Amino acid sequence: MPRTQLIADYLRAQARSRIDRVEKDDHGHNARTAIALIDAADYVTTLDEHAQVLVRLAVAGCFSGGRFDPGGEGERIVGDWHHDLGPADPAELLESLAEAAERGVALAPRPPQPRPAYP
């Protein structure tokens, strides 16, 4: 499945979650977030599969197991994102996700290196 479709599916699922969420005194936050995420999902499907931001997400390991996983920080970015707060447009959302994923890779513990055998 194309990476653009994996991201779009993820964003649409997050939008559905926001639509289903009922919170007292939300003042339309969930609705605005859902609409913004649907817009972002549509935007992603217009990107070339070799767009730099998609390559960055792939190198950071966001496409595994046949799905898009933005990591913990990326999930928080998506969860809090809408047009009133955070990135102003879908391109900025993707850029924020790529930056978060790259930070996650940089901070991840590295596996131990094998020790050379001594004669």
Features from the language model and the residues they span:
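Charged, low-complexity interaction regions
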Residues: I19-A31, P87
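Generic structural concept
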Residues: A8, R12, A34, I38-A41, ...
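Amphipathic alpha-helical oligomerization segments
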Residues: R3-V22, Y43-G79
